[in-house]
Swiss-Prot record:
One of its GO terms (cellular component) is oligosaccharyltransferase complex. Signal peptide: none annotated. The keyword Disulfide bond does not apply. It comes from Rattus norvegicus. The modification Phosphothreonine is found at T124. The gene is Krtcap2. Pathway: Protein modification; protein glycosylation. Pfam families: Keratin_assoc (PF09775). This is Dolichyl-diphosphooligosaccharide--protein glycosyltransferase subunit KCP2. Residues 24-34, 109-136 are cytoplasmic.
Length: 136
């Protein structure tokens, strides 16, 4: 099921806002045990993915289709937002958020390159059909 760019912008923005609010509401519980701090980093990574999706959809609406997110400023801005939100919970959440975000970014890049990158045809060297001189 594919949604349009505007709908995707609205959904990812709403999910980013709800995830940030949920992280702040349950910050004491997320910081209470080791496993929940790791889960807090995982939630921060989800915030990174949703905010990056919203940011890129906004750019596609403003600048037109085919506009791609670059490392600076889009990815770094969304990563800093997610790391800041995770840092409000616990400092271990920042580390796990960074690790989960980098793994998620790797797979997002891998999937998008297989879907949207055009493959260049393989060039084969042409045979030279000229006459060669015989040397005695």
């Amino acid at each position: 099921m594919v949604v349009g760019t505007g709908t995707s912008l609205a959904l990812s923005s709403l999910l980013s806002l709800l995830l940030f609010a949920g992280m702040q509401i349950y910050s004491r519980q997320l910081a209470s045990t080791e496993w929940l701090t790791i889960q807090g980093g995982l939630l921060g990574s989800g915030l990174f993915v949703f905010s990056l999706t919203a940011f890129n959809n906004l750019e596609n609406l403003v600048f037109g289709k085919g506009f791609q997110a670059k490392i600076f400023p889009e990815i770094l801005l969304c990563l800093l937002l997610a790391l800041f939100a995770s840092g409000l919970i616990h400092r271990v959440c920042v580390t796990t958020c960074f690790i989960f975000s980098m793994v998620g970014l790797y797979y997002i890049n891998k999937i998008s390159s297989t879907l949207y990158q055009a493959t260049a045809p393989a060039l084969t060297p042409a045979k030279v059909t000229g006459k060669s001189k015989k040397r005695n």
